[in-house]
Amino acid sequence: MGSTSSLYAAIDLGSNSFHMLVVREVAGSIQTLTRIKRKVRLAAGLNSENALSNEAMERGWQCLRLFAERLQDIPPSQIRVVATATLRLAVNAGDFIAKAQEILGCPVQVISGEEEARLIYQGVAHTTGGADQRLVVDIGGASTELVTGTGAQTTSLFSLSMGCVTWLERYFADRNLGQENFDAAEKAAREVLRPVADELRYHGWKVCVGASGTVQALQEIMMAQGMDERITLEKLQQLKQRAIHCGRLEELEIDGLTLERALVFPSGLAILIAIFTELNIQCMTLAGGALREGLVYGMLHLAVEQDIRSRTLRNIQRRFMIDIDQAQRVAKVAANFFDQVEKEWHLEAISRDLLISACQLHEIGLSVDFKQAPQHAAYLVRNLDLPGFTPAQKKLLATLLLNQTNPVDLSSLHQQNAVPPRVAEQLCRLLRLAIIFASRRRDDLVPEMTLQANHELLTLTLPQGWLTQHPLGKEIIAQESQWQSYVHWPLEVH
C-alpha cells in the first residue's frame, strides 16, 4: 500500500449528480488524477412523502459501482464519502446508504447543511484567488448553500431548502419556459432567502464566488459568446429572456450551454437571479473548487494560504525549474513601469497582479526549448492547473506570454476576456519592455528609467549615454520600437 499512500479520494453524493475526485498530494498541494461525474438526479426520485423511488436508488448504486473500481487502490482512511440534501431528506435514506457502503467498502456520511456549507467554503478558500472577505454561493440539486467568511474562517453559514432539481420539478414541471414560471420560481426563492439575507449582509463581502453547476454553465456560456467572465444581474436577465424566447425546455438552445446542463439551467438561473436581487450582488465569479476540494484539503490538514496565486506560481516555478531570481527581476521592472503609467492609463490593481504573474512565469517555455519559447510558454500556461486563477485570467497570462517578444499578435490579445482589449495591449507593452531591460540577469545592470504615458504614446527616458554605451541594447530597443509601431503602439526612447 506504501506506493499509493499519497492518493486521496472525495465522493459527493449530490441531489443532481454524484462526483468523485481522486488526487495525489505533491509538495503540499494537490494534483488532480481523476474526476468522474454522473447525472443521477436523485432528488427527482423523491415522492410527496419524501421516499426515494427504487429507480432513483438503482441509478445511484449503479454509479457507485463505477466509483468503487477506482477506490480499490486507495487506503480507506484516505477516502471520504459524503451525502447531501436529498439523503438528508429521504425517509428511506438508510436503505440507500447501507447498500452504498457495501458497494464502496467504506462509510458514507450524511452531512448537515451547515457542515456542507463549511466544506464548500474550505474548498473555495483553498483554490480561489482574490480578496479575502467573500460570499460563497453553491446551488445544488436540492439545497443552496450561502457562506460568508474571511480567509479560512467562516462568519455565517446557511443551507436553504431549494435547488435546481427541486425547483425544476416544482416550477417548470410542464417544461414551459414562460415568464410566469420564472416569476413563480424567483418569488419562491426570494421568500426562502429573506430570513437569512440580513445576517449575510451584516457580515458583508468584497467578492462573491459561485461554486455550482449553474455558475459553471454561465461561465461556459459567457466564454463561448466572447463576454468577460464576470456574472452580473444584467447578464442573467438577458439569458432569462433568451430562455423565455426558446419557449420550452426541450427547445432551449443557448450558445455554450451543453445538453447535459440544459435541463436544470432555467431553475438554477431563477434561483441565482433571486440571490442577486435579494442580496444586491453586483458581480460574481466562478470558484476554483468547492465541496470535494474541501473534503480533500481537510484530509490533508493543509493550512489555507493567504495568497493562493503566489503558492501556485511558486509550485510551477519549482516544477519547471524557472530561474526565480530572474523572474523577480523582470517583475520588479514591470511593477516599476506599471506604477509610473497606472494613473494615466487608469489601470486597476488586478491588472498589476496579472502582469506580475506573467513575469513570474515568462521563462517557462525554456523548459521545453529555446526555439519558440513564447509559444511553449503559452501552451503550458493555458493547459496547466493554476489554482487561484480563473479560466479567463489563465487565457490572459497565456496570451501575454505568447506576445512577450517578436512581432505582436494583436488578435490574440483581443480574444482573451479577463480584461478589456486595450488593457491587455498595455500590459503586453510593459511586459515586453521589462523583459528587455532585465535581460542581462543582474540587478546592477538594470538602468534607472522613467516611463511616461500620454494616451497611447509611451516615452522611455534612459540615463544619459546609456544607448551609446550599450550598442546591443540600443539595437534591441530599436527593433522593439519598430515591432510596437507595427501595431500602432507609439514608443519613444531617449
From Swiss-Prot:
Gene3D superfamilies: 3.30.420.40, Exopolyphosphatase. Domain 2 (3.30.420.150), Hypothetical protein af1432 (1.10.3210.10)
GO molecular function, one term: guanosine-5'-triphosphate,3'-diphosphate diphosphatase activity
Protein name: Guanosine-5'-triphosphate,3'-diphosphate pyrophosphatase
UniProt key word GTP-binding: no
Any one biological process term the GO annotation gives: nucleobase-containing small molecule interconversion
Key words of the record: Hydrolase
Enzyme class: hydrolase
Chemical reaction(s) catalysed: guanosine 3'-diphosphate 5'-triphosphate + H2O = guanosine 3',5'-bis(diphosphate) + phosphate + H(+)
Function summary: Catalyzes the conversion of pppGpp to ppGpp. Guanosine pentaphosphate (pppGpp) is a cytoplasmic signaling molecule which together with ppGpp controls the 'stringent response', an adaptive process that allows bacteria to respond to amino acid starvation, resulting in the coordinated regulation of numerous cellular activities.
Residues spanning the signal sequence: none
UniProt pathway annotation: Purine metabolism; ppGpp biosynthesis; ppGpp from GTP: step 2/2
Family statement: Belongs to the GppA/Ppx family. GppA subfamily.
EC number: 3.6.1.40
